Amino acid sequence: MRLTGEAEYRIPFTFIEALNEGTLFDRPAHAFLEAARERRLFHVLNVTTDNIIGTGIIQGSGDEKSTKQAEVGGLMFHPAARGFGLCSLLVKIMMVYAIKESGRDSPDEEYLAHVVDGNGLPLHSLLEAGFRPIGPVDVHRGDIDAVIDHMIKGGESVVHMHGFVFDREAIGKLVLSLWKFVNEDHGVIARSDPAGDIRVTVDFSNVIPPTDLNI
């Protein structure tokens, strides 16, 4: 798991475009470029094949509200990489990095996430990573720098979504969770499968140095 460099911003952009599952905001390429410049764009790489298997983005609201808001989204994993808990792990890393490591966080910044009705995949990952539900939210065109028309049902003008906000008091638990993953699980995720046990080793040390997880 790594931060996406400015020169690499199209890698997660084209990955999401290629999967085209219709459950995510259709963010323009420049949103990924801006996130990469701000060190708020992440991707997961299979180092054996050198192929991208997952993405995540923290996108600024772009307006001048007294309370800053950022949208945590773009959470997409290749179907073959699902079921390992990688999405949950990525969101934890994103939030710990954003708040503890990036140097860009401000105490009044709100980190929001929205999940479209019927898309249950990200719910567990968000809850595991310290987000709490804030109820139904209607997202209108222009609320975020992204195209949402493909998510609007016939005859309506909004997208019905479930809203979540990050609980800043959860950051200590997330740091502890990542420390245990590195020091007790040795960065290994194991899953039993009818074809045999599968072990996945995850390294995110270039995003959060292990020494920064010391408790």
Predicted segment positions?
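A short beta-loop-alpha structural element at the N-terminal edge
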Residues: M1-T14, I171
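Active-site rim helix/loop that mediates acceptor-substrate recognition in acyltransferases
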Residues: L19-T48, I57
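Glycine-rich phosphate/pyrophosphate-binding loop shared by adenosine-nucleotide-utilizing enzymes
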Residues: T49-T55, A70
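Conserved acetyl-CoA binding element of GNAT-fold acetyltransferases
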Residues: S66-P79, H114
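Conserved acetyl-CoA-binding loop-helix of GNAT-fold acetyltransferases
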Residues: F77, G83-K100, H124, E128
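Conserved active-site alpha-helix within GNAT-family acetyltransferase domains
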Residues: G103-R104, D117-P136
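Conserved beta-strand-loop-alpha-helix junction that forms the acyl-donor binding cleft
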Residues: E109-L123, H140-I144
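C-terminal "cap" of GNAT-fold acetyltransferases
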Residues: V139-N214
